[in-house]
Amino acid sequence: MELGRISAIFRYPVKSMAGELLDVARLSWHGIEGDRRLAFRRLTDKSGFPWLTASKLPQLLLYKPFGLDSNTAERLPTHVRTPDGKEYELRSDELREEVSSRYGSDVELMNLKHGIFDEACISVLSLGTVHGIERESGRDVDRRRFRPNVAIETRSAEPFEEDRWVGRTLMFGEGNSGAALRVTMRDERCVMVNFDPDTAERDSEVMKTVVRMNGNYAGVYGTVVRAGELRVGQVVTLGA
């Protein structure tokens, strides 16, 4: 059954920093290549989730990785532009000190080749869900608030139709040889959706609306069952 087409592809090389909008991406066994391979670890945190995220430091969303390192297999960024417009090498002490100072505690940059994910290696969101939340909340809701890897413009445009995809397969492109993922669970949202991706300002009405409309779920997570290329405009089919 044809669901619609890919509207946008995002990757987030550094966890909780600004994402990159892509026209084409390689979907590997560990998600989109280069996605969330880097993160800042809070050195004083002894929990099982020590990563610094925008829930702890909203301004992290305003740091913009850029450049491409041709010496890395997944072509990770080389530099980061800070909210103040300063530019540092990604792996430099200057950037580490800048982030540590803004957070108020020491951090260090970590590189995990299989990615640093909250639940699963790829997330998918329909534009119908975004538009439904917009209508209900009375806000202009940027799809980037939800930090999806793949945004789909579905034929029905029904909000939260992704919920019905759980346990089924999304296939990308024509035929049966393209990339595919198994939808494993709904995406339960956190305070991240409240932050404007351009200003880091908080608007709690966004998350309240998601809770009211769909029990705090918006979008889905999946695991890769067939690697391949993703491309904006590509047909998306729902399989068994």
Model-found features: residue ranges?
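Metal-cofactor-dependent catalytic cores
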Residues: 1-240
